[in-house]
Amino acid sequence: MNDLSRNPDRLNISQKNKAIVDELDRTKFMNLDSGSITRSELFLFAMSLGAETVPTKLDTINPGGFILEKSIDSTTLACIYALSISKHSGTDLDDITDKSEVYKLAQEYANTGFEIIENYLSAKKNSRDLLWELMREADEQYRMLHTVPC
């Protein structure tokens, strides 16, 4: 294993999902374009969408990467590590501090999320309707988290 894979310096997305990001920039779909939000925020949004699914294994990585590590904001980094902790099933706590594994997991879920975004794009849903749908889903998840059994 080379040093780059052991100590990654960027977050990557697949080549297919790079095309989806380009389409978001072109269409300004849901204001997810680079003029409206940072790449860190877009990555986090995609990762959040993908987090409730089976992650997509990364086959073809966009060679330029998506976000250099120095550009990852603290909120995104905290969420990446929180995702790793929440998905951790082993007994070795060193796994949740292994940056290579943490980034790999985040990238897999983000790439899954970009595929979900692609489905939204191809369904040609109205951005406002989609936003309300996502808010209803978030409300439902919040209720599930905060419902105390009687």
Question: Which residues does each PLM region occupy?
Answer:
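Charged, low-complexity intrinsically disordered terminal regions and linker tails
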Residues: 1-31, 44, 56-150
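Short amphipathic alpha-helical segments
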Residues: 37-47
